[in-house]
Design a protein with these regions (language model features):
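Alpha-helical transmembrane segments of integral membrane proteins
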Residues: 1-9, 32-36
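Helix-termination/interfacial motifs at the ends of transmembrane alpha-helices
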Residues: 5-8, 12-25, 143-146, 150-229
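Large intracellular
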Residues: 20-161, 233-286
Length: 286
């Protein structure tokens, strides 16, 4: 929603201001300039990225126009799920978790948290390390090291679309200049035309520079920032799972382990101690 608001504010400010000072909006409509700038940007994007990055970027872009799914309620659900699983392991033994982690979609515990179950990255990360915990062949230090490596790998993969968008955005002003120079060349080749026509041709050429800068800093740059923020939010989910499981492996009770997880969350989404305590009580009562 905020993306649409930001886009509307940008367009109204730029084009509205131009119209208020007496400019003719029709002069800014230059399909050929748009074709040159957009085509060069798309070509550079394809040239500078592999198939994997191109696919992931195309998949990420539509999600940017939706609100973030990682909010306070989701984090509360995550800590509630972790508490239930760790409490079951502590009370009935870690081997009792096998049926839940082998097929989470059929697990009566996981099925109570459909939002989390829909995120296969989160479910896979959680079940993989619970499986290692059940196996009992690795200590907490080894599991922590492995978790750090996987989180770093995920972060690098997740950042690829944001970096790809950022590089294209950074290049758009230059492509705008290219389009403008091409327009100036065309104008100079038509030096025998009347001044009125030459003035119109120069104005058309300058639109290229304007569009390149506007597209870069008004649209593509902000989208790359949103993509980067979404990666950071998902990474925070992994970190919450990590510290909670490690706290359990180090002997802390489930209620204390989820408190470890709470402390790593961003302050804007982090529940208070009493909120988490009350949530754990409700989970216990189920």
């Amino acid at each position: 929603m905020l993306i649409f608001v930001g886009t509307l504010v940008t367009l109204l400010s730029v084009f509205g201001g131009y119209a208020l000072e007496g400019g003719h909006l029709g002069a800014l409509v230059q399909p050929v300039e748009i074709l040159m700038i957009a085509g060069a940007g798309i070509g550079a994007f394809i040239l500078g990225n592999g198939v994997k990055t191109i696919k992931s970027t195309l998949l990420v872009i539509p999600t940017l126009f939706k609100g973030s799914k990682y909010n306070k309620d989701v984090y509360m659900e995550l800590m509630g799920l972790l508490y239930v699983l760790l409490a079951k392991a502590r009370k009935e033994g870690t081997l009792t978790l096998e049926s839940d982690i082998e097929d989470p979609h059929k697990s009566p515990i996981f099925s109570q948290y459909p939002k989390l179950l829909a995120d296969h990255h989160i479910v896979e990360f959680m079940t993989d390390y619970l499986r290692l915990m059940v196996g009992g062949n690795m200590n907490a230090f080894e599991i922590e090291s492995l978790m750090d490596e996987e989180i770093e790998t995920h972060h690098v993969e997740g950042e690829a679309p944001a970096l790809a968008l950022q590089k294209v955005g950074d290049a758009m002003p230059a492509f705008g200049i290219v389009a403008a120079v091409m327009g100036v060349v065309h104008t100079m080749a038509s030096a025998d035309q009347p001044p009125a026509i030459l003035g119109e041709m120069i104005a058309q050429a300058l639109v290229g520079t304007f569009l390149g800068i506007l597209i870069s800093y008004g649209f593509i740059g902000p989208l790359s920032s949103v993509a980067e923020q979404r990666v950071a939010e998902q990474t925070k989910m992994f970190q919450c799972i990590k510290v909670t499981i490690l706290a359990s492996l180090n002997g802390y009770a489930p209620a204390i382990a989820v408190e470890f997880g709470r402390k790593v969350l961003f302050s804007t989404e982090r529940p208070s101690f009493s909120e988490l305590e009350e949530h754990v009580r409700r989970v216990k009562a189920k």
